């Protein structure tokens, strides 16, 4: 009986991991008190109302595809990118940061760095994969 339970559990976990649409088996350890986490539907509504989107992924990923209007603000080159975009960042009332998904801490780090500079920013839960999965618009290339 134990062998059947073990085999069934193993098969279920393997399917969950391989399906690409599996359930998260742990809480996102990157989320901290004070983080403003939003879902893809709310993010899209905010984009339509003029929110500034910030892509925390490495710039090469941004160039492949990003949310329309998003600025590249990669966590691994934050200071340089922040300096380049500071006037726009300081003028926004609504910023949303995203990165590569569940296992990506970059959006959380960028949002906290912005908050330290007096710029509140929400974090798109599940990031870029959630946006793509919802079939929301994307843009290719280096232009926002």
Predicted features by range, described:
Residues 1-64, 144:
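Flexible, polar/low-complexity N-terminal or interdomain linker segments that lie immediately upstream
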Residues 30-32, 84, 91:
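Long, low-complexity, proline- and polar/charged-enriched segments
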Residues 48, 52, 56-80, 88-90, ...:
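Mid-length scaffold segments of soluble, non-membrane domains
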Residues 52, 120, 137:
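Residue-level detector of anion-binding/catalytic polar loops
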Residues 59, 76, 100-102, 127, ...:
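Solvent-exposed coil/turn segments that connect beta secondary-structure elements
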Residues 86-132:
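Catalytic cysteine-centered active loop of the rhodanese-like fold, especially the PTP/DSP P-loop
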Residues 135-144:
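Active-site neighborhoods of enzymes that stabilize oxyanions during catalysis
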């Amino acid at each position: 009986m134990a062998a059947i339970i073990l085999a069934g559990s193993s098969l279920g976990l393997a399917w969950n991991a391989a399906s690409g649409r599996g359930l998260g088996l742990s809480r996102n350890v990157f989320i901290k008190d004070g983080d403003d986490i939003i879902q893809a539907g709310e993010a899209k509504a905010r984009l339509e109302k003029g929110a500034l989107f910030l892509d925390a992924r490495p710039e090469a990923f941004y160039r492949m595809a990003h949310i329309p209007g998003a600025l590249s603000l990669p966590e691994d080159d934050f200071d340089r990118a922040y300096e380049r975009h500071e006037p726009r960042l300081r003028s926004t009332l609504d910023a949303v940061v995203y990165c590569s998904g569940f296992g990506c801490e970059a959006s959380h780090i960028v949002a906290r760095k912005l908050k330290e500079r007096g710029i509140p920013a929400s974090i798109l839960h599940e990031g870029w994969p959630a946006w793509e999965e919802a079939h929301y618009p994307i843009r290719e290339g280096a232009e926002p």
